[in-house]
């Protein structure tokens, strides 16, 4: 929707040749005098060439779209969160008391030139505040839809959201509240035009071509007063005139009349007004474009076309935030060159001049010339100064500490001030002194980043040096006192930092290192605390490893023999080792300067971890396989051995069933004994309960899981107890059946006549064996072997071994047979008569 107003430029063509050379000189001068921001700002980084765009954007520039500007949000910005202030109230009183605090809250007090200022002008209830809120994310009050009445009273100011732009919302003109009293309208319009870089003129499409409706009468008065009050004294100085951009925003544009025609109408009216002005001496031939640049844009109807309105506002916002936009509005030549910290005084002085100079009493020509020349000389001196300090940035930003930085900064600053004093001291002394102070502040502002960067690098270097020195002493000193080491190295680091920081402090500055020293002290203390925590953790970990190593054997020995006092032995060993671990911690923690809370928390954590380590050993000794072996051994001791420990040989008359039941029941009782840690001595349990169950966690450390000491006393759950009992019963039943079978086989009877038959039938074989020493000896060996197998009850294992041997022999034989039969059969040789004689003779046998 942005078009070039070619027709308007044609109306002004006859005046261009007269002041073209002056305009070129003005551009060259501005290019050599860049605005240097004290803080990073998008406008400060844009080149002057990029900003030197004439009256309106070229017609060849297409309308920006959301696709061509992906960095522009398609949604309106959120309301500003930094607050607003009433700069000038309804009684025309300037609110200087609240300006500086608001500037601090907005983060612009130290912005230097890194800010921009714009204002809006227009009739009452034309949506000025709504437009500003949409464009900049401000939170100015807007008119209620239900009652068309004055909303903005006086002049309000707010900072744009996420941009260093100060926005002034000016009370609307032609309001019924003030009626014919146009005094405040003129003053507020003149104030806005004199102070703002960009003045947004908000009007409806149907107001274009009107005289009062388009505020042309007001603009005529403002142009004339502004020209006489602020510009006449600079008429003879080429390129020194301040320029302001007038951005006409034509609202409720329906598209019937092109923007080109609307802008041409407005430019024609403005040119006519300018020609009718009573110009001061020296400005009779001046053109309106010598003091103002113009841009024009349109917006659709906000109510009838809300989507198109929002999209157009987004495109318009790009002019204010994107320095690369060809229609970027905050150009260098529009900036008033007032540092942010002096903005309050500057705006107040403008308002006082507007209020009190009824007859347009101007400052003297001497003061005006002094102001201009001092600014010019200061800019030249600062340019040489900026060139001479460029090398500092590379070293400082590279993280290096420049030892001679203080002396070098003082030398370059003194050189710049000397150049300024030599050339500027001839002019008005009050202006010279004021400008010298301004230059000194500017020089100090340029050196301040190097000063802060040097402190930052020193800060980082001292932290590294402190940490490395502490670690080196901890490695080289075997019996070091951690608290003494930290205190000593801390004093050394702070002393070195203070000495190096004092070397870069310059006179005539408000620089101080007190905050940096305090910050360094805090960070060193933080590093010390971190190192102390790490060393404490290492110490506790070493104590835990020692405890784990020592607790294993006592637990294993105590649980190996199942008896009622086994848990007493385990807990006594645990308490003894825990006391040793706590004593070791307390002895070593003394040198770490740990607080009582830290010690209490560490001891509590040590107790809990030690207990869990002991529980882990208990779990190892009560695993299913281990506890099954323990139960089996206990059962065998009671069933297969008598009270004297002699193996039993069961006879038919022995009470095997009673012995089996007794051994089984006694063994099953052991499961309940292993299931829970319960000492016979209740004193032990009370002491442990006081250490674990009654203690509350201390400090800021939160454990991953809640510690439930009472729950850790349970070793075997009910499910595990049932499973272990069932498996044991099966094993015990198997042992009983085996013993019973051996007894039954021993009492089986053979008929007596069978022995006679065997003797008669086997008499010959018997005599052959008895008469042969070899057979007889072999018979004796078999009888002895059988007796041994029977006596030691090895029949079961022997059968298992024989079965395994048979299976292995079967496997090997099967493998050999498969290998043999898997080979192909050799073909038989053909008979000799079917082969040639030569082949038969040559063929080997």
UniProtKB/Swiss-Prot annotation:
Q: Report the transmembrane regions from the record.
A: 750-770, 774-794
Q: Would the keyword Magnesium turn up in this protein's UniProt record?
A: no
Biological process (GO) annotations? endoplasmic reticulum membrane fusion
Q: Where does GTP bind?
A: 122-129
Which GO cellular component terms, listed alphabetically, does the Swiss-Prot or TrEMBL entry include?
endoplasmic reticulum; endoplasmic reticulum membrane
Location relative to the cell: Endoplasmic reticulum membrane
Outline the segment boundaries, as ranges, of region: Disordered: 823-845
Say if the entry is tagged with keyword Secreted.
no
Q: What is this enzyme's EC?
A: 3.6.5.-
Q: What class of enzyme is it?
A: hydrolase
InterPro entries, alphabetically?
Answer: G_GB1_RHD3_dom, P-loop_NTPase, RHD3/Sey1, Sey1/RHD3-like_3HB
Q: Which residues form the GB1/RHD3-type G domain?
A: 112-334
Recorded GO molecular functions are: GTP binding; GTPase activity
Q: Which Pfam families match?
A: RHD3_GTPase (PF05879), Sey1_3HB (PF20428)
Give the Cytoplasmic compartment stretches of this protein. 1-749, 795-845
Q: Kindly give the membrane topology term recorded for this protein.
A: Multi-pass membrane protein
Q: Know the name of this protein?
A: Protein SEY1
In the UniProt record, the gene name given for this protein reads: SEY1
